[in-house]
């Protein structure tokens, strides 16, 4: 046997990796020898045993340049193979790469291919896993060739036989056994791996594929087709793995004549029999080490035990075969060998896994070494430990510049030691490396000077775990400091999410020139001022700095020097330094720059003393010229640091003001000036926080006096409610809700009172109020608990449905200043603990969400400038009303490219032509301009780039406000931008200590602009009612669903805005009215849905029976008796059914209209009463979420949307436009029919008790919900198509983040992820392509497959075509035209063809987990989840990984194809290197030539 001499398969550059099943030949080609003995090392000499699992002869020496027996030592014998012990003299590192093998006595089935779902071997042989198992584990025989005996006995190929049946046939037909094995008449049956090997070897895959496709086309049985499809997938995978490989032609050596030369191609691929192994590879010994411990014991890798079991059993079996042992014993030994090999490859799949002796845990097999967080992929390939790094505790460094960090000397000397040593040797301070090291150890003073020089201009990277987004690693210029803690700048804490309570950070040194350059240019902290997730600044002052700036810029009447007039800002500073004027004094300053007035100067003239009339007159004239500034001394001081271009900032600076100012600075004056400004205001902020001496004393928390009265009143009210409940006039639910409402109102009242009290205290200079108002620390919520009352406490519960018991109804009346009673304290501990436990549990969930997002989007990279699409998405101004002003129209379009002209409808002006970028200025202008009501913008969702996305569809890079560059890894940025706030989402209840905040729902809808009202499909009726004051009034009631109010421009009649009007709303405006901004259009009741009579007639109740379907309850306020529908199913026998409904009948008793009444409805009408149009028949209450801000609903909701899960109680959605009708009622469901004018009808069955939104005869549109409940994204995709579902997902996720958590994430990040969820299509009809029905493939691959077929035709009749043309086959159109020309010329019959059929498909919405597993890259999918399954499928299909994404390249150790790792940049640097080398060579040649000529002259 010849072994390849250790040729590494990865020598040189490679661009793709192919996966396939290893053939016995390839295993032997990689092996250096056979392992024959189970021994590892000799326990006396501690040397490896020869031919054992650690053998030096096979795997290489254990000591560098030394053979086993010691005959050859030293490097000079390199490459010699010792004649005594057979060991090659080489480095010991080869023990990490050299492999061995074990030759098995009988073939063994590879467990991956037989236990995978579906079983690969089972699919090929058409056997179930159970039957396969019985054959493999030597329980039954399988017939390989029935021969004559089989025919006579009616036995077919692949039949299973028991031992008795087998021996019966063998004895009955003894002569038959003498025939040759290849004789078709001979009866052959075998068991175990051998049988499977023989069967797989005899398979004809091409024939099998044709037969299976025939079944798919022609079979009527659904089950048969499903089975055929499952098998065809495996067969096709094997067939696809065969691909032509160029054969290297040997130069003619006379071995065979030229005409006998072989074909230039051979077909290489997976043969099915490779799934049964005859040879097992043994991995290198250093990858399964054996380490000696103290006390003469050894720690060993589990793999050694598993290999040992295989070798022992294999050797025993060989012996037994040699001595001709009985069949029973052999069979048992063979079965044990099969089990040993199974355990070696995958020990976790088996029920009876092999366990260790002592701790009884399953041994870690080869599969386990790849799987999971501790597996090879995630532990060693995706994350590695790095040298040149250190970590330490962090402390604040307030005197540092923004781009600096303080590095302890002791750390710096360790990190930069090699560079220091080199300097010391170069400068001759030390003679050798050794002496330089000694100098360093002695801490010689000269070393620090050298270190200073070494680190100058060399950035270091700081990282704080967990690194949730890219700002978790930033570069800084190190400054050497004494001490042992790293100092960091206070402004970068936000980005790192760091504080100084013991956090640690890691330091890394970029070594290469390129790495240093990238760190300085791209990663320096002063270049990362903007958050990539929202485009908002991240280096925002906080806490002390904010408080200092707020204190500095606040004004106070009556300060020293108030009302003085100064000629310029310098004069003000002189006066202040001379202490002639107070910091908060209002003064008049002559100023020539840009003025943004905050005070009305003429009104402020009163603060000038009356004895200076001429000053007042002079001021009046100057104010007219807008040259006089009314400001405070502090603001003048603050504005010294604001760049001139920005103008004078004349307002109190709080946290939000600071944030907006920094945002403005970064876009207008650039990073350098902004960084300088930040450093200045840091100094100013800290200085004035100190000067102001702002700290909280107990006296600063002021409790309002009115609190006592409010509480007395509330206690009275709640006692009254309880009394009514005891009388039986209130239900439990109503009592609870009313008490909660009473206390909620009181808590809010007291909170507002205490806030106002603080605001007025010391004319706004109460330290507690200043901290709150400036945004430095604390929230209104906390102040309420300190000085108002703690109020109601939420009871921790998972559900968010608003059921009773979510809020503990006894409030905490005390506040934290007064102190809590024992009971109150006990009640509040509950919520506080929940906050902490939630935090720790949810952080893991958020981390897992981030990981899945990363995996699904890691290969989305900007690959081209413009994909050329004309499509885009449509954005309307209505988004603001829907989200309560949280999401602005301008935010939706900012930084995008317009796909159509953006037009001002009022003035007919094009504000921005198609293809233009919507910059910040344009976006703000559009926001203010009411004429722009809609915009079409380019989006990632509609990008048509072949791979990755294009920069026009993505828009601007948020962190630099420029169009995104090619090579930007936008997928990873998107994943980080969504995942990082995900961990904040979780910490939401944390600070409020679990107190409940209930919202009082908004009932009025106001116009957001001036305009004229136009009604669209609104049917209304006027109704007499009694208002709150007891006076009669007429209201206009909307009695039609889907009504709309449009706002038009009064002059041109152009459409500006649309509002949806709910059923039962009260109209405040009339059609054609002119309305102003903030005028009320209509009001609606948010807590309930009303059922309103739409026709006149008499009421008739059906199935509304007292005690069965309704009960009587008394309304506490009015004393009216209410009839409430109850769940009747609990009251009746199983066979009985009821459907409570209200009919309206005419005089003849004919039914005019039917209204089903859902459970919990209140009836507002009596049986037999006459009703007019617009009368209320019943009210259906809605559940309101009472508990505010607990994000437990937030994260699971986001996960549900990203995973595209079907909601637990989904709404039933109409699939067509049409009119609603009802079918007969069943026991547990009722039928809704939707019929359109073309006679198409769809039927839906609804569970009884579910509220049906549609009434008989209502018109509905496709996609409209017919019942209540959440709409399933899968339904939206099916009915309204991919665009609708993409928009739905983006908007819904955005709502959770913005409204529940107040976190801003730009839409484009969500779009990148949602695009990935819709990348796949499912093939419906494959046509003439090679696809299979039901295949899930990438959209681009589907388009490619169809375009391939579009150039081909199918031959229907071959005429006189040459023999190579077959009927029914596909050929290129050009080829057939050419052949037909030839045939026509020779007057022969032409070839008849028809166009090839294209495949059809429908888009599929995948959750992010499925999408990540379905990625084109094998390596990426394998490192994500289900490693063994992914690798098995890839090996069978011979898949090729093109290394297109980031993850694959990290794993194989290449530069990532993004940023500076893009191919075009790499090529650039290689070209430059080549040029540099050429010019250096030329120079050297010149010099050599010159030297030679010099010698000649001499």
UniProtKB/Swiss-Prot annotation:
Disulphide connectivity of cysteines: none
SMART domains cross-referenced by the UniProt entry: RPOLA_N
One Pfam family hit: RNA_pol_Rpb1_5
EC number(s) recorded for this UniProt protein: 2.7.7.6
Keyword Plastid belongs to the record: no
Molecular function GO labels: DNA binding; DNA-directed RNA polymerase activity; magnesium ion binding; zinc ion binding
Statement: the UniProt record of this protein carries the keyword Protein biosynthesis: no
InterPro entries: DNA-dir_RpoC_beta_prime (IPR045867), DNA-dir_RpoC_beta_prime_bact (IPR012754), RNA_pol_asu (IPR000722), RNA_pol_N (IPR006592), RNA_pol_Rpb1_1 (IPR007080), RNA_pol_Rpb1_3 (IPR007066), RNA_pol_Rpb1_3_sf (IPR042102), RNA_pol_Rpb1_4 (IPR007083)
Keyword list, A-Z: DNA-directed RNA polymerase, Magnesium, Metal-binding, Nucleotidyltransferase, Transcription, Transferase, Zinc
Residue positions binding Zn(2+) 1: 67, 69, 82, 85
Binding site for Zn(2+) 2: 867, 943, 950, 953
Catalytic activity annotation: RNA(n) + a ribonucleoside 5'-triphosphate = RNA(n+1) + diphosphate
CDD domains in the record: RNAP_beta'_C, RNAP_beta'_N
One Gene Ontology term, aspect cellular component: DNA-directed RNA polymerase complex
Function: DNA-dependent RNA polymerase catalyzes the transcription of DNA into RNA using the four ribonucleoside triphosphates as substrates.
PANTHER family attached to this UniProt entry: DNA-DIRECTED RNA POLYMERASE, DNA-DIRECTED RNA POLYMERASE SUBUNIT BETA
Similarity annotation: Belongs to the RNA polymerase beta' chain family.
HAMAP family given in the database record: RNApol_bact_RpoC (MF_01322)
NCBIfam families with a match to the protein in the record: rpoC_TIGR
Protein known as: DNA-directed RNA polymerase subunit beta'
Biological source species: Chlorobium phaeobacteroides (strain BS1)
């Amino acid at each position: 046997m010849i072994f390849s001499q250790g040729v590494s398969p990865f020598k040189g550059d490679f661009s793709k990796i192919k996966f396939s099943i290893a053939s016995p030949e390839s295993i032997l080609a990689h092996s250096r020898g056979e392992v024959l003995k189970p021994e590892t090392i000799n326990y006396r000499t501690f040397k490896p045993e020869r031919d054992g699992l650690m053998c030096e002869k096979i795997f290489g020496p254990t000591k560098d340049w030394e053979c086993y027996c010691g005959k050859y030592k030293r490097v000079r014998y390199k490459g010699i193979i010792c004649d005594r012990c057979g060991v090659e003299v080489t480095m010991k590192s080869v023990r990490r790469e050299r492999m061995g093998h074990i030759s098995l006595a009988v073939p063994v089935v590879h467990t991956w291919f037989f236990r995978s779902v579906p079983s690969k071997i089972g699919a090929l042989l058409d056997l179930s896993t159970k039957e396969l198992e019985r054959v493999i584990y030597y329980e039954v025989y399988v017939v390989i060739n029935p021969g004559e005996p089989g025919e006579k006995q009616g036995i077919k190929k692949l039949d299973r036989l028991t031992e008795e049946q087998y021996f019966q046939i063998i004895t009955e037909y003894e002569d038959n056994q003498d025939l040759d094995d290849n004789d078709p008449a001979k009866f052959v049956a075998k068991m175990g791996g051998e049988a499977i090997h023989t069967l797989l070897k005899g398979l004809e895959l091409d024939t099998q594929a044709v037969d299976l496709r025939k079944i798919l086309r022609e079979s009527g049985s659904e089950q048969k087709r499903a089975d055929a499809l499952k098998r065809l997938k495996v067969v096709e995978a094997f067939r696809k793995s065969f691909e032509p490989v160029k054969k290297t032609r040997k130069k003619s050596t006379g071995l065979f004549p030229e005409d006998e030369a072989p074909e230039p191609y051979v077909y290489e691929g997976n043969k099915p029999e490779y799934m049964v192994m005859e040879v097992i590879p043994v991995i290198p010994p250093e990858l399964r080490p054996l380490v000696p411990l103290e006390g003469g014991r050894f720690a060993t890798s589990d793999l050694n035990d598993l290999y040992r079991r295989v070798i022992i059993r294999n050797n025993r079996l060989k012996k037994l075969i040699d001595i001709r042992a009985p069949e029973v014993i052999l069979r048992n030994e063979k079965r044990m060998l099969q089990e040993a090999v199974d355990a070696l490859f995958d020990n976790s799949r088996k029920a009876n896994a092999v366990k260790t002796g002592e701790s009884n845990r399953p041994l870690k097999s080869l599969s386990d070494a790849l799987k999971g967080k501790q597996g090879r992929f995630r532990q060693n390939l995706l994350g590695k430990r790095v040298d040149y790094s250190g970590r330490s505790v962090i402390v604040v460094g307030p005197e540092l510049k923004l781009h600096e960090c303080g590095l302890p000397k002791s750390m710096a000397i360790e990190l930069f030691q090699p560079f220091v040593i080199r300097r010391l040797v170069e400068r001759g301070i030390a003679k050798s490396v050794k002496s330089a090291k000694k100098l360093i150890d002695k801490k010689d003073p000269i070393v620090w000077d050298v270190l200073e020089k070494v680190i100058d201009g060399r950035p270091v990277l700081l990282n704080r775990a967990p690194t949730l987004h890219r700002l978790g690693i930033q570069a800084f210029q190190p400054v050497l400091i004494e001490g042992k803690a790293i100092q960091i700048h206070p402004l970068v804490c936000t980005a790192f999410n760091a504080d100084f309570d013991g956090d640690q950070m890691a330091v890394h040194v970029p070594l290469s020139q390129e790495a240093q350059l990238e760190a300085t240019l791209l990663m320096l902290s002063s270049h990362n001022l903007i958050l990539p997730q929202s485009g908002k600044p991240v280096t925002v002052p906080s806490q002390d700095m904010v408080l200092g700036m707020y204190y500095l810029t606040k004004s106070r009447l009556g300060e020293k020097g108030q009302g003085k007039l100064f000629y310029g800002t310098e004069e003000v500073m002189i006066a202040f330094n001379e202490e002639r004027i107070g910091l908060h004094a209002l003064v008049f300053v002559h100023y020539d720059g840009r003025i943004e007035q905050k005070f009305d100067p003429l009104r402020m003239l009163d603060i000038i003393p009356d004895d200076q009339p001429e000053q007042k007159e002079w001021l009046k004239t100057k104010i007219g010229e807008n040259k006089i500034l009314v400001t405070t001394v502090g603001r003048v001081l603050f504005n010294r640091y604001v760049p001139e271009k920005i103008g004078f900032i004349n307002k109190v600076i709080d946290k939000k003001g600071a944030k907006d100012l920094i945002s403005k600075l970064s876009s207008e004056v650039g990073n350098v000036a902004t960084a300088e400004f930040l450093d200045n205001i840091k100094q100013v902020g800290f200085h004035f926080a100190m000067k102001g001496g702002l700290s909280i004393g107990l006296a600063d928390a002021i409790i309002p006096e009115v609190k006592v009265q409010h509480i007395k009143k509330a206690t009275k009210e709640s006692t009254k409610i309880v009394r009514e409940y005891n009388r039986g006039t209130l239900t439990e639910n109503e009592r609870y809700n009313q008490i909660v409402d009473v206390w909620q109102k009181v808590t809010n009242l007291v909170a507002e009172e205490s806030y106002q009290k603080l605001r007025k205290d010391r004319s706004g200079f109460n330290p507690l109020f200043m901290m709150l108002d400036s945004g430095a620390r604390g929230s209104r919520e906390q102040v309420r608990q300190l000085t108002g009352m703690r109020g109601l406490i939420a009871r921790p519960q998972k559900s968010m449905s608003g059921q009773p018991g979510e809020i503990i109804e006894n409030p905490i009346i005390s506040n934290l200043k007064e102190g809590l009673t024992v009971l109150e304290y006990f009640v509040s501990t509950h919520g506080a603990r929940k906050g902490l436990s939630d935090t720790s549990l949810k952080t893991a969930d958020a981390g897992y969400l981030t990981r899945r997002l990363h995996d699904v989007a890691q290969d989305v990279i900007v690959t081209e400038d413009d994909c050329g699409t004309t499509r885009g998405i449509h954005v309307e101004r209505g988004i603001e009303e829907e989200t309560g002003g949280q999401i602005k129209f301008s935010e939706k379009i900012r930084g995008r490219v317009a796909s159509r002209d953006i037009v001002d409808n009022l003035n007919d002006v094009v504000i921005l032509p198609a293809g233009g970028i919507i910059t910040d200025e344009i976006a703000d202008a559009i926001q203010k301009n009411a004429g722009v009501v809609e915009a079409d913008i380019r989006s990632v969702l509609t990008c048509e780039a072949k791979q990755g996305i294009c920069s026009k569809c993505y828009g601007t890079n948020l962190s630099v406000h420029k169009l995104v560059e090619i090579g930007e890894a936008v997928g990873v940025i998107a994943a980080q931008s969504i995942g990082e706030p995900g961990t904040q989402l979780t910490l939401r209840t944390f600070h409020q200590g679990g107190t409940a905040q209930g919202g009082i729902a908004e009932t009025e809808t106001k116009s957001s602009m001036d305009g004229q009202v136009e009604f669209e499909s609104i049917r209304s009726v006027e109704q007499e009612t009694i208002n709150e004051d007891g006076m009669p009034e007429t209201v206009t009631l909307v009695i039609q669903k889907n009504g709309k109010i449009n706002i038009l421009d009064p002059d041109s009649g152009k459409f500006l805005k649309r509002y949806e009007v709910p059923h039962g709303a009260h109209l405040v405006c009339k059609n054609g009215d002119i309305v102003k901004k903030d005028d009320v259009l209509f009001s609606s009741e948010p807590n309930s849905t009303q059922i309103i009579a739409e026709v006149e007639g008499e009421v008739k109740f059906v199935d509304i029976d007292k005690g069965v379907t309704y009960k009587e309850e008394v309304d506490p306020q009015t004393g009216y008796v209410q009839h409430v529908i109850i769940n009747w199913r609990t009251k009746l026998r199983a066979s009985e059914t009821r459907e409570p409904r209200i009919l309206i009948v005419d005089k003849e008793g004919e039914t005019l209209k039917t209204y089903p009444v859902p459970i919990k409805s209140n009836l507002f009408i009596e049986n037999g009463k006459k009703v007019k149009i617009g009368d209320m028949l019943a009210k259906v209450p809605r559940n309101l979420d009472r508990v505010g801000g607990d994000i437990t609903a937030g994260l699971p909701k986001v996960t549900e949307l990203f995973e595209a899960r079907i909601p637990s109680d989904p709404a039933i959605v109409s699939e067509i436009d049409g009119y609603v009708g009802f079918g007969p009622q069943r026991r547990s469901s009722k039928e809704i029919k939707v019929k359109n004018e073309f006679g198409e009808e769809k039927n839906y069955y609804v569970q009884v008790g579910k509220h049906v939104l549609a009434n008989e005869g209502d018109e509905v549109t496709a996609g409209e919900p017919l019942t209540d409940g959440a709409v399933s994204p899968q339904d939206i995709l099916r009915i309204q198509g991919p665009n609708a579902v993409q928009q739905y997902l983006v908007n819904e996720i955005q709502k959770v983040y913005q409204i529940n958590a107040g976190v801003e994430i730009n839409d484009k990040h969500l779009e990148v992820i949602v695009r990935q969820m819709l990348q796949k299509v499912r093939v419906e009809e494959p046509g003439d392509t090679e696809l299979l029905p039901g295949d899930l493939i990438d959209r681009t691959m589907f388009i490619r497959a169809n375009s391939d077929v579009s150039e081909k035709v199918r031959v229907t009749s071959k005429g006189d075509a040459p023999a190579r043309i077959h009927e029914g086959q596909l050929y290129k159109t050009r080829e057939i035209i050419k052949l037909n020309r030839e045939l026509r010329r020779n007057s022969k019959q032409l070839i008849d063809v028809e166009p090839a059929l294209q495949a059809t498909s429908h888009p599929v919405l995948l959750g992010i987990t499925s999408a990540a597993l379905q990625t084109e890259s094998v390596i990426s999918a394998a490192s994500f989840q289900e490693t063994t399954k992914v690798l098995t499928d890839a090996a069978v299909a011979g898949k090729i990984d093109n290394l297109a994404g980031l993850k694959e390249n990290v794993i194989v150790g290449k530069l990532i194809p993004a940023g500076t790792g893009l191919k075009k940049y790499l090529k650039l640097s290689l070209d430059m290197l080549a040029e540099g080398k050429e010019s250096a060579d030329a120079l050297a040649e010149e010099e050599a030539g010159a030297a030679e000529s010099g010698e000649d002259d001499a």
